[in-house]
Design a protein with these regions (language model features):
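Short, ordered, surface-exposed loop/turn motifs in non-cytosolic proteins
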Residues: 4-39
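A short, solvent-exposed beta-strand micro-motif common in secreted/extracellular proteins
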Residues: 35, 62-81
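Short, acidic Ser/Thr/Gly-rich low-complexity loop/linker segments typical of extracellular
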Residues: 38-53
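Zn2+-dependent metallopeptidase catalytic core
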Residues: 57-59, 77-80, 107-152
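Structured interaction patches on ligand/partner-binding surfaces of diverse proteins
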Residues: 75-112
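Long, charged, glycine-rich C-terminal linkers/tails
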Residues: 147-165
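Active-site scaffold of zinc-dependent metalloenzymes
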Residues: 163-193
Length: 193
């Protein structure tokens, strides 16, 4: 299970940055919750490893379509990336599968078309956010044992740098709120992301 990692480039001379889509590389979606579902019923749950690999066993009843779902949520520590403009739904990618021994490779793409984002294909962003948070948490955990509280990160392509109703994407700027104990991250194309 992988996502498109797009490096950021900063120019000291122009004091501006951009994303280098021509340098995109696939990276593993690590320690993420992965599920086999039959319709809306969860048949099996597990986690990807550090290489984005997984193995799940399940018994299907045959009553619905089978799918493999990878959530933008890690298992330890628990970090999840939600869409604050869609009822706090956890971001995910999925694909259909069949019964029996199945290999299914899922990939979250960046959705950049060369001039703009295709919103239906912009699935890498929440996994890139998740991977950055997971990398930071792991860095702390390698120094000494740390018990992290569950962290909720709110990202949406509708999050803009305007104050107002966060459920509508008006988050002001990327920030942590101590009242909610959650992080909000800008996501609107061309709006300080």
């Amino acid at each position: 299970v992988t996502y498109d990692f797009v490096p950021a480039i900063y120019s000291p001379s122009t004091r501006s940055g951009t994303l280098a889509f021509n340098q995109t590389t696939p990276r593993p979606i690590r320690n993420a919750v992965i599920q086999v579902r039959e319709g809306t019923t969860i048949l099996a749950t597990g986690a990807t490893d550090e290489q984005g690999s997984y193995s799940l066993s399940f018994n299907a009843s045959g009553s619905g379509a089978l799918s493999l779902v990878v959530l933008a949520k890690t298992t330890s520590p628990v970090i999840q990336v939600e869409d604050n403009t869609d009822g706090d739904a956890v971001w995910a990618i999925s694909g259909s599968i069949t019964t029996g021994n199945t290999t299914k490779n899922l990939h979250a793409g960046h959705g950049w078309t060369g001039s703009s984002f295709n919103p239906n294909q912009r699935t890498a962003a929440p996994f890139a956010v998740l991977d950055s948070m997971y990398t930071a948490a792991k860095a702390f955990m390698t120094v000494r044992p740390v018990t992290f509280p569950e962290l909720k990160v709110n990202w949406s392509p509708d999050n803009v740098p305007q104050g107002g109703d966060k459920k509508q994407g008006f988050i002001g700027t990327s920030h942590y709120t101590s009242q909610e104990k959650e992080i909000y991250i800008l996501g609107k194309e061309g709006a300080d992301t």
